[in-house]
């Protein structure tokens, strides 16, 4: 195999390993943010995977058009009104600049090789005043920090998560990456669903009656940023 063929095969394998889906709590968090911000217009689901979030967003009847893009083929149950593009998201996307009012990306950036290139791509694809919402593992939770201390890696970046998860980001990394791409300072929202170290099926929220939440007690975070009007 050539280097390009080998890389393509590696990326496809990583995509297959990931399964192309996220948790219901993450999808719900996206829906809540979209409703709170009253976002409308043309939406891009960047890294749409098996289309679970794409289909849920369509049922909201908020958007004039929805486009899904992923290395995976178009799911058979995707509505014909949704445009689907099969594309390796590590590569430059051949879409016109300023095509979308909203970009969502659920648990995708940690799968990609160059988050800075991705942020620049998002910025170019958004219209002025457009909104970016993406999620990624929260590497600053107690569960993840303890894993780093005891095992030498964040909890979502163990050998069992590889080669799907390859890019671990902290809030400071995200702030810098988005700033370099000229986005507004990001806001962070936490899913408030988080496993207890060594007992991941037990959640802090259940144990504490919902009192424990936020950065130390959430497995995932959402990032909200805007493209300035000028």
Predicted regions span which residues?
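Conserved N-terminal segment of class I S-adenosyl-L-methionine
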Residues: 1-98, 102-104, 116-119, 134, ...
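A SAM-dependent methyltransferase catalytic signature shared across enzymes that methylate proteins
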Residues: 172-189
């Amino acid at each position: 195999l050539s280097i390009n063929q080998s890389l393509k095969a590696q990326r496809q394998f990583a995509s297959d390993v990931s399964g192309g889906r996220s948790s219901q709590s993450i999808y719900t968090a996206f829906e809540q943010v979209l409703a709170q911000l009253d976002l409308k217009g043309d939406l891009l689901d960047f890294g749409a995977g098996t289309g679970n979030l794409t289909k849920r967003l369509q049922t909201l009847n908020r958007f004039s058009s929805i486009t899904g893009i992923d290395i995976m083929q178009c799911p058979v149950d995707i509505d014909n009104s949704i445009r689907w593009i099969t594309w390796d998201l590590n590569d430059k996307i051949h879409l016109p600049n300023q095509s979308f009012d909203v970009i969502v990306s659920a648990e995708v950036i940690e799968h990609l090789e160059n988050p800075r290139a991705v942020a620049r791509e998002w910025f170019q694809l958004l219209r002025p005043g457009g909104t970016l919402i993406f999620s990624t593992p929260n590497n600053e939770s107690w569960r993840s920090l303890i894993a780093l201390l005891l095992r030498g890696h964040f909890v979502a970046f163990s050998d069992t998560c590889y080669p799907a998860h390859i890019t671990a980001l902290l809030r400071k990394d995200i702030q810098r990456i988005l700033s370099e791409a000229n986005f507004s300072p990001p806001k962070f929202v936490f899913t408030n669903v988080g496993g207890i170290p060594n007992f991941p099926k037990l959640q802090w929220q259940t144990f504490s009656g919902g009192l424990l939440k936020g950065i130390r007690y959430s497995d995932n975070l959402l990032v909200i940023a805007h493209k300035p009007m000028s």
